[in-house]
């Protein structure tokens, strides 16, 4: 039976109606600070914790509830003779329900408050009460989420007590709540400047907080269950995780993966760009004067694969672009926005998933990334692989000309474009590019020459006069020979093979320009 509740919350959503229902059941409510004032102002009978413990708040509120009369009332095991004797001897009444949520630490960090102001928002008494109540869940209920108020109030109104199952479920939620809170603190401190750059990027203990955004219909395949979890803080750069879904069917596991691949690839470009993704791999990428032109050119690279694909654009979609998009069956489109005419046209495709990420139209240099957003995490059974995200980029001046002939200005433009694309293709990756669009893509092969052959075989556009990007060096000259045979005139690659001299000799013999970036872009 719930006779007494301690209520102290930062998030006061639904607080007063819930407290009134408790009071109507005759539950004595203990409270502190702002929560106590809010309840008293609403006419809810409330007892100050300071009056209850006969120990007023001290240190400007830093110590309020850290008292044996509070924690003894929460933690004592009902029915255990030794515990009953202890609380009776010390006049400690039972506290049967603890309703607490914690100081808004994450909000303070997100608001960019100074370091010590953020530290001041680290709750001490709240987590202690939550953990005490959760540990004693056999006898005490603990509520950390306003979404549970209705359920708890209804159950108490029906039986004056909480069932074992309800207390257990609330216990799980409470420990998850405090764990997430502590992880957020750890993440914040890890992000502080350190003299050890490696320790800052890869701390001894990695704590990350993700909240369940929802269940998915299934995972990668129907026999695999799936769910989507979102980070506690929205990144400054545009992301799929925080993009706004405007219409369409529920996003699937594969949709989310493909959307992220499309978004990552289109974010490489400051010019008007479009990326078409299929099975997490680009099948067409193009720049254009307008979004409509960029999409039409990207689609033309591999129109068969584009069917049922995912499209990312880095400029708002207008009526002309919408017309092009509606001419093809697509799963998803993500863009910075859509004008009224575009929304009307795309709205006719009821199942088409439209996502909006407004900052996608902004220059990449305008996005800031926190240290945790510079990491890429991949799970393996029993462990986690962590590395820096591949944000490596090169300029013309960073490259070294390997051959007798240097690229022309037009070739340079296409080479740098191909280099931005090839890092998003599964290794071994080869991209043929011409006039700032892909004309042939080959990836996922176990030998580089086979990726070249795949790109040539799949090409729907003229390869003569094209340029080629390779995500890693050519281990043999055979790949370059196949590129020359296809009609390409310039190649960009990392360089560094022991057979570079043979590869360069083959390029020179065909008057093909080749440059080395000194940077590899493997993608597994």
Curated annotation (Swiss-Prot):
Swiss-Prot/TrEMBL keywords: Hydrolase, Multifunctional enzyme, Purine biosynthesis, Transferase
Superkingdom as given in the UniProt entry: Bacteria
Name of the protein: Bifunctional purine biosynthesis protein PurH
Transferase among keywords: yes
NCBIfam families reported for this sequence: PRK00881.1, purH
GO molecular function: IMP cyclohydrolase activity; phosphoribosylaminoimidazolecarboxamide formyltransferase activity
CDD domains: IMPCH
Enzyme Commission number(s): 2.1.2.3, 3.5.4.10
HAMAP family to which the protein is assigned, alphabetical: PurH
Species assigned in the record: Anaeromyxobacter sp. (strain Fw109-5)
Domain MGS-like: from-to ranges: 1-144
SMART domains tied to this protein: AICARFT_IMPCHas, MGS
GO cellular component: cytosol
Pathway: Purine metabolism; IMP biosynthesis via de novo pathway; 5-formamido-1-(5-phospho-D-ribosyl)imidazole-4-carboxamide from 5-amino-1-(5-phospho-D-ribosyl)imidazole-4-carboxamide (10-formyl THF route): step 1/1; Purine metabolism; IMP biosynthesis via de novo pathway; IMP from 5-formamido-1-(5-phospho-D-ribosyl)imidazole-4-carboxamide: step 1/1
Family: Belongs to the PurH family.
Gene3D superfamilies the UniProt entry points to: 3.40.140.20, Methylglyoxal synthase-like domain
Coiled coil segments of this chain: none
């Amino acid at each position: 039976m719930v006779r007494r509740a301690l209520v102290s919350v930062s998030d006061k959503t639904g607080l007063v109606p819930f407290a009134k229902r408790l009071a109507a059941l005759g539950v004595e409510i203990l409270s502190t600070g702002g929560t106590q004032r809010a309840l008293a102002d609403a006419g809810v009978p409330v007892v100050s914790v300071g009056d209850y413990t006969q120990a007023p708040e001290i240190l400007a509120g830093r110590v309020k509830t850290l008292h044996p009369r509070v924690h003894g009332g929460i933690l004592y095991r009902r029915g255990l003779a030794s515990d009953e004797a202890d609380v009776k001897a010390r006049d400690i009444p039972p506290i049967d329900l603890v309703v607490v949520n914690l100081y808004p630490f994450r909000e303070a960090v997100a608001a960019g408050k100074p370091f010590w102001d953020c530290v001041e928002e680290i709750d001490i008494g709240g987590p202690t009460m939550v953990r005490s109540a959760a540990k004693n869940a056999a006898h005490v209920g603990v509520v950390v989420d306003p979404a549970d108020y209705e359920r708890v109030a209804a159950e108490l109104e029906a039986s004056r007590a909480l069932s074992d199952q309800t207390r257990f479920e609330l216990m799980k939620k409470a420990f998850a709540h405090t764990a997430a809170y502590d992880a957020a603190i750890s993440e914040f401190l890890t992000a502080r400047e350190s003299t050890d750059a490696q320790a800052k990027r890869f701390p001894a203990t990695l704590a990350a907080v993700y909240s369940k955004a929802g269940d998915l219909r299934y995972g990668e395949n129907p026999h695999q269950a799936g769910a989507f979890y979102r980070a506690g803080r929205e990144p400054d750069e545009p992301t799929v995780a925080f993009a706004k879904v405007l219409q369409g069917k529920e996003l699937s596991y594969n949709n989310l993966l493909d959307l992220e691949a499309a978004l990552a690839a289109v974010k490489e470009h400051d010019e008007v760009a479009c990326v078409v993704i299929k099975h997490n791999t680009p099948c067409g990428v193009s720049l254009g004067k307008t979004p409509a032109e960029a999409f039409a050119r990207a689609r033309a690279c591999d129109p068969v694969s584009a069917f049922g694909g995912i499209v990312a654009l880095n400029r708002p979609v207008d009526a002309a672009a919408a017309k092009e998009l509606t001419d093809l069956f697509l799963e998803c489109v993500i863009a910075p926005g859509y004008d009224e005419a575009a929304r009307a046209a795309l709205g006719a495709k009821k199942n088409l998933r439209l996502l909006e990420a407004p900052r996608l139209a902004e220059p990449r240099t305008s996005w800031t990334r926190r240290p945790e957003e510079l990491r890429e995490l991949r799970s393996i059974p029993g462990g986690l692989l962590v590395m820096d995200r591949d944000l490596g980029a090169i300029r013309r001046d960073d490259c070294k000309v390997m051959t007798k002939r240097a690229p022309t200005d037009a070739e340079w433009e296409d080479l740098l474009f191909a280099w931005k694309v090839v890092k998003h293709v599964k290794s071994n990756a080869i991209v043929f590019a011409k006039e700032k669009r892909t004309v042939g893509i080959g990836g996922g092969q176990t030998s580089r020459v086979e990726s070249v052959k795949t790109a040539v075989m799949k090409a729907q556009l003229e390869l003569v006069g094209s340029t080629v990007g390779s995500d890693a060096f050519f281990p043999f000259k055979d790949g370059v020979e196949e590129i020359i045979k296809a009609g390409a005139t310039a190649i960009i690659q990392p360089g560094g093979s022991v057979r570079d001299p043979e590869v360069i000799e083959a390029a020179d013999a065909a008057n093909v320009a080749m440059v080395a970036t000194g940077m590899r872009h493997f993608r597994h």
